[in-house]
Amino acid sequence: RKIMALFDEYQSRENAKHTLRAMKENARQGFWNGSRPPLGYRVVVAEERGAKLKKKLEIDPIQADKIRLIYKLALFGVDGCGPMGFKAICNHLNDNNVRTRDGGRFGIDAIHKILNRPTYKGEHHFNARDHKTKTKRPEEEHAICAVPAIVTADEFQAVQDSLRLRHASFMSPRFLAPGTLLGG
């Protein structure tokens, strides 16, 4: 029984290795491997290969406008008043009744993920995290899948630079909080 259990365990590991390799190749070819697509995208059937349906991501026009609004708020703010942070964007969207795909309210974590996800500039990273430990994998293990871009690479980079400059490791949080007397 122990020998059979060891053989089954080995076979299971081999199957997992081959499945992951196939999914990485599928992603490199630009196909979606499953799961729920990011906000702003929808899954469409791209082609049929025998009984298998190959799917790709397509921009969902209604949801994509929300993503563009979030990036605009992060760069310019409301009416050009200056860049907004995660919480300010979240509050603005919820106050103006802008909802998620499911009709829920936006949270700070959702805004953080949207502003930091390279999928929106046209490159989805498959296999970016270890599913067991939830840790980031090295960049060379990622399979990059080309998807339609919702924001330009320049807009994405401008948001990343803005977020990095306002990060607490670059600037003290007391200078970021509005209303701090002589804080600037």
Predicted regions and their residues:
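Conserved catalytic breakage-reunion loop centered on the nucleophilic residue
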Residues: K2-G184
